[in-house]
């Protein structure tokens, strides 16, 4: 394990594996650097890249601050980019894709950007979280009701059936990993605030994101995720959409398929 110090003094933990161009992995909600899917993906990509797999603040071995702002998480990613040599390829998953996107828009030196199913809700098709979603997640965590927060985030935020959460509760290894990072769910909710209301993305919203960008979706994914991916690819000035079966993230990451597509994108001319 390595650490880097973010702008506000918070220690950010990361693992570094492989040799080659620098690639930073930005996890989504419920995930962290030791999450099995993250570990597998980092291992597969290490054949081609120096992979930096880090714990977002508040997770795993990373520190945290008394109060959260999106800007602090953006500074964490910038610290990782600096640690990786000042520029890097970046892959972000779900809320991590939104974090990577916001950091890119703020001027980070990202050579190429892969945005994997950012949960943007751009119309009324499919699932849409309730209007008080962000507030309710924070209330549950403030009351230390982690189990309820997990269920609420998954069912109301992600649209998962209640029985799926019930099954996870009786899987000790799975549930313990979720409980360990549940207190950071308000961070993910804050990142998504304003992007899950069913409204079209404003034109030129992310015009500053000029690097080559790959927006990834699985054809098996929920319609709201797919529509969001299509809208984002059309909104960014230098992006293309990759749509294939097996690239979804709502069940289990197919790390072999994903790593293959990421290697082709980051190492290719387009």
What function would you assign to each model-found segment?
Residues 238-270:
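Catalytic active-site module of serine/aspartate enzymes centered on a nucleophile-bearing elbow/loop
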Residues 3-63:
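Conserved HGGG/HGGXW glycine-rich cap/lid loop of the alpha/beta-hydrolase fold
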Residues 43, 52-89, 260:
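Active-site loop/oxyanion-hole signature of alpha/beta-hydrolase fold enzymes
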Residues 55-59, 119, 245-248:
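Short beta-to-alpha linker loops that shape the active-site pocket of alpha/beta-hydrolase fold enzymes
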Residues 177-234, 243:
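Conserved serine/cysteine hydrolase catalytic core
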Residues 87-124:
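Conserved hydrolase catalytic core segment
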Residues 35-37, 62-67, 125, 226-227:
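Conserved catalytic-core motifs of eukaryotic protein kinase domains, centered on the activation segment
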Residues 118, 122-175, 188-189:
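Helix-rich cap/lid subdomain of alpha/beta-hydrolase
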């Amino acid at each position: 394990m390595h650490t880097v110090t973010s702008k506000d003094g918070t220690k950010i933990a990361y693992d570094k594996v492989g040799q080659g161009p620098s690639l930073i992995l930005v996890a989504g909600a419920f995930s962290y650097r030791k999450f099995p899917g993250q570990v597998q993906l980092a291992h597969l990509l290490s054949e081609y890249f120096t992979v930096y797999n880090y714990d977002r603040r508040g997770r795993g071995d990373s520190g945290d601050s008394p109060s959260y702002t999106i800007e602090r998480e953006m500074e964490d990613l910038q610290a990782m980019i600096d640690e990786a040599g000042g520029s890097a390829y970046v892959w972000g998953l779900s809320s991590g894709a939104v974090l990577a996107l916001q950091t890119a828009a703020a001027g980070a030196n990202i050579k190429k950007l892969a945005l994997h199913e950012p949960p943007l809700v751009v119309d009324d098709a499919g699932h849409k979280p309730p209007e008080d979603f962000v507030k309710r997640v924070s209330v549950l965590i403030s009351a230390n009701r982690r189990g309820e927060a997990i269920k609420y985030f998954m069912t109301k935020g992600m649209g998962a059936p209640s029985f799926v959460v019930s099954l996870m509760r009786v899987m000790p290894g799975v549930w313990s990993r979720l409980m360990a990072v549940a207190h950071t769910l308000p961070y993910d909710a804050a990142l998504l605030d304003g992007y899950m209301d069913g409204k079209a993305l404003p034109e030129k919203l992310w015009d500053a994101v000029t690097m080559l960008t790959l927006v990834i979706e699985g054809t098996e994914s929920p319609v709201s995720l797919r529509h969001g991916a299509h809208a984002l690819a059309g909104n960014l000035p230098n992006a293309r959409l990759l749509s294939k079966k097996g690239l979804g993230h709502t069940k289990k990451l197919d790390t072999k398929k994903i790593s293959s597509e990421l290697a082709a994108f980051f190492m290719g001319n387009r």
